[in-house]
Amino acid sequence: MFLFSRKTKTPISTYSDSYRAPTSIKEVYKDPPLCAWEANKFLTPGLTHTMEQHVDPEALQKMAKCAVQDYTYRGPISGHPYLPEKYWLSQEEADKCSPNYLGSNRYNTWRMEPYNSSCCNKYTTYLPRLPKEAGMETAVRGMPLECPPKPERLNAYEREVMVNMLNSLSRNQQLPRITPRCGCVDPLPGRLPFHGYESACSGRHYCLRGMDYYASGAPCTDRRLRPWCRELPTLCTSLRAPARNAVCCYNSPAVILPISEP
């Protein structure tokens, strides 16, 4: 077994009979001097160092500010294929798209279709309209309606949700008695009279039947395309139980549609 000396790096045996004198050169290790600058030994002879140029701090700050603005307001066309910033909406755009603020109509939370909202146009196309003289609207307006049009109503799921909610509201509190708006009286006791609403899409006034719901104020106060049924005499045709001699036999939910007399 051999031990190595730290100074001479000479192997020294632990046995006395195998000991030999060290023959290596003794070296003294010193710490390198602390210097801030050291000459470049690999510099090509004949070349001199460049003189240090004066840097203006104001110009440097201006360059940094321009770089930050260039990075912040970069062009719309970028090399990256996907930029999530393009799909971010501001708070104003989010409020416009929200159903609570769409057309300032509280009934939009029930119906989210574009043409069921009272803030949309009654026409279902963006093409230019034909003149009233050449269109079918003049001919249809002059002839009497034998069969009432198909009513605008909720689908099965929305209707079930609304009925359950209104029934729960009617069980908790006593609903007020209100004078019928269209002169329609529900034969079933314990319910409120029929309440109608004016649709801006079709320009007609519809009477709701079989729904224990009443809202204070007119549903459509923003845009009134037709006057209320108080001013125009209407004929409320019941479609709940059509008679045998009815003009149009149409199986639909309980809805009363007005027909304006020419």
From Swiss-Prot:
Keyword annotations from UniProtKB, A to Z: Cell projection, Cilium, Cytoplasm, Cytoskeleton, Differentiation, Flagellum, Mitochondrion, Nucleus, Spermatogenesis
A GO BP annotation: spermatogenesis
One annotated GO molecular function: alpha-tubulin binding
One family name in Pfam for this protein: SMRP1
Listed GO CC annotations: axonemal A tubule inner sheath; cytoplasm; cytosol; manchette; mitochondrion; nucleoplasm; nucleus; perinuclear region of cytoplasm
Locations listed in the record: Cytoplasm, Cytoskeleton; Nucleus; Cytoplasm; Mitochondrion
Taxonomic superkingdom: Eukaryota
Assembly description: Microtubule inner protein component of sperm flagellar doublet microtubules. Interacts with alpha-tubulin.
The protein's role, per its UniProt record: May participate in intramanchette transport and midpiece formation of the sperm tail. May play a potential role in somatic cell proliferation.
Family the UniProt entry places it in: Belongs to the SPMIP6 family.
Protein name (database record): Sperm microtubule inner protein 6
